[in-house]
Each structure stands twice: as C-alpha cells, then as structure tokens.
From Swiss-Prot:
This is Gramillins biosynthetic cluster protein FGSG_00039. Pathway: Mycotoxin biosynthesis. Keywords: Virulence. Part of the gene cluster that mediates the biosynthesis of gramillins A and B, bicyclic lipopeptides that induce cell death in maize leaves but not in wheat leaves. The nonribosomal peptide synthetase GRA1 incorporates respectively a glutamic adic (Glu), a leucine (Leu), a serine (Ser), a hydroxyglutamine (HOGln), a 2-amino decanoic acid, and 2 cysteins (CysB and CysA). The biosynthesis of 2-amino decanoic acid incorporated in gramillins could be initiated by a fatty acid synthase composed of the alpha and beta subunits FGSG_00036 and FGSG_11656.
Length: 333
C-alpha cells in the first residue's frame, strides 16, 4: 500500500470485503455495513486531503514563473510525452498521440483561444472564457499535470508545473475543468481518474492482506469496470488516460480485455500479469516494482493538480473537490 504510514488504508479496509459475484469467477468489493463505517471514511477523507495538501505545499515552493527563452515550457517538456509514453507526434483528441504542440508553448496562443467580451459586444457580463470547443487545450493542460507528476527529470517536472501556474495567472484555466458533452472530458478528469485507480488499488490490496483467501486483482469486478469503461479508453479528449494505458498495457491488460473479464469470461489466452500476484519470477517481480512507481505517479498527479487548484479556486472549493471525488470512489463500490 502506498503511503501506508500516512493514510489509514487498513482502517477503511476493515469495513470492506471481497465477495464472489454470483456464479461469475469475479469478486465484488463490498462494504460490510459496520456502524463505524461513516466515521472511518470521514476520517480517511480528511487525512487523505491533508496529505495531498502537504505534498502540494512542497511542490508550490518549486514554481518558477520565469519563461524559458520566452516560452511557457521548453522542447524537453514538449517532447516528453513521446519519449516517456511512446506516443505518436502531436494530434488532438487521441490517447495515442502527444496532446502538446509547439503552439502550446506560447502564452499568446492560449490567450487568443479564449473568447473575449469584444466578440459579444461591450457588456461587462462577458469576459474571456473557454468552452467545449477547447477540449484540445484541456488535454494539453492534462499533459502538463502528468508531466509535472511523473517525469524522472526534476527540471522537466518544474517547467511543466510552472507553465501550468503561469497559464492559471493569465488565462481562464478554470473553465477547462468541467468540460462536458453529456460525458466529461475536462481538465479535472486527470485528477479524477488517478484518484479512482489509486484508491481502488490500495484498498483492494489492504482488503486482500486481511483475508486468508488470495483473490486475483484481475478478478475484482469494480477495477475491471473502471479500466474497461473509463481509464483505458481512447474516447473524446482522453489525455488523462495516457499514463494508465501505459502501465496497464505493459501488463497485457487492455480496455477490451478488461471488458471481457468484467463480463465474467473465465479463461483467456492473452498473456496478462497480476501486479499483486504472488509469483516470484522475474515478470512478477518487475510488475510489482512498476506498480509501486505507478501508485507513486498517481498520487503525484493528485498533488500537482492540487497546486493548480490553489491557483484558481478558493480553499473551500478546493477541499470540496477532493471530498467529492473521494466520496464518489466509495459510492462507486
């Protein structure tokens, strides 16, 4: 479990169990309905939010608002998604291509994309804003969050974070958070997806560690549904899914595989690896090492996004966002 010295995973795990899903080979992660559940979850939520804030405070001190050679970020940041995730050259609306482009290095481009009052007349009720037509900008911002969280290069991480904060100071980045066409594709999804998988993986591992029966991670239905329906999909403006696709695909787990497993398929000839499996071979050892890095990256996405929230939202709104997202994961079970 990640940060088990800070986050009370074992406490909330004592309120859940893994139960067989009828005649299916899958298991459900279900609440036991204990009288202490609400208090335990409330305590966990408060500790989790405080821990995110602790890490984000450290990151905030690393922000440098000076531009790199007149640009928001250097070519090292621009090319990072292709080098790190193996993505193709820039294209929009794709989890297979780099969502960052050279034009995103220019603050004036971001300013020019924001609709202004002059387009609507002189009424003061109108101000510069972004809309659902700007999903590509949301994806570019998601990748700045991801880069600031997962790069092994400190200079690249700081550049990406500083670029995000510069944008927050000069253009209406808050507008990009909740973009939706009935289904969401806004900037906030970069945090939502990372939080969901981070919590599910840690909670499942904590519940497993309490029981005598070892249930494969790849037979827990709630995780399979999360992967197959959301986190591995390549749908409208899916940049938030890029780091998750990279990790799970490395284990042989694709969105179509997860969908079939969630439907109760009993056998598959496709080679997949359970990163929580007990195998002691080189493949499983490497998977466990990569899982630790993945969980660290997911948590880093959370505190980098919290740095961003501090730039554009009130303290109350920021805490409400995290509380809502944490509770939504629990209600998802």
């Amino acid at each position: 479990m990640h940060l088990d010295h800070k986050l009370p995973w074992k406490t909330i795990a004592s309120h859940f169990t893994l139960a067989r899903d009828g005649s299916s080979p899958n298991y459900n992660l279900i609440a036991l309905g204990l009288s202490t559940q609400d208090a335990a979850l409330g305590h966990f939520s408060r500790i989790f939010i405080a821990t995110i804030e602790e890490f984000s405070n450290t990151e905030t001190s690393k922000i440098n608002l000076n531009q790199v050679d007149g640009k928001l970020f250097s070519d090292d940041v621009l090319n990072f998604p292709e080098h790190h995730f193996g993505l193709g050259p820039h294209d929009t609306n794709s989890a297979l291509n780099n969502p960052l482009d050279a034009k995103h290095q220019e603050l004036k481009y971001w300013k020019g994309r924001a609709s202004t009052a002059s387009e609507y007349g002189t009424s003061p009720e109108y101000s510069a804003s972004y809309s659902t037509a700007d999903g590509d900008l949301a994806d570019a911002a998601k990748m700045l969050v991801i880069t600031a969280a997962v790069s092994d290069n400190q200079a690249i991480r700081r550049e990406a974070l500083s670029a995000l904060c510069q944008l927050s100071a000069h253009v209406p980045m808050s507008d990009l958070r909740g973009l939706s066409w009935g289904h969401g594709f806004g900037l906030s999804l970069v945090a939502s997806e990372a939080l969901k998988l981070y919590m599910l993986l840690n909670l499942i591992e904590a519940v497993q560690s309490r029981g005598a029966q070892q249930v494969s991670l790849l037979r827990v239905k709630i995780l399979l549904c999360a992967l197959g329906n959301y986190s591995l999909q390549n749908y409208d403006f899916p940049a938030q899914n890029i780091p998750h696709r990279a990790f799970w695909h490395s284990l042989g787990i694709t969105e179509s595989w997860a969908d079939r497993q969630a439907d109760g398929v009993r056998e598959s000839d496709e080679p997949v690896v359970d990163p929580l499996g007990l195998g002691d071979d080189e493949i499983h050892q490497e998977a466990r090492i990569n899982l630790k890095k993945y969980l660290k990256d997911c948590f880093a996405i959370l505190y980098v996004y919290d740095v961003f929230l501090k730039q554009i939202a009130s303290e109350e709104e920021r805490k409400e966002f995290w509380s809502y997202e944490i509770n939504r994961v629990i209600l998802y079970l």
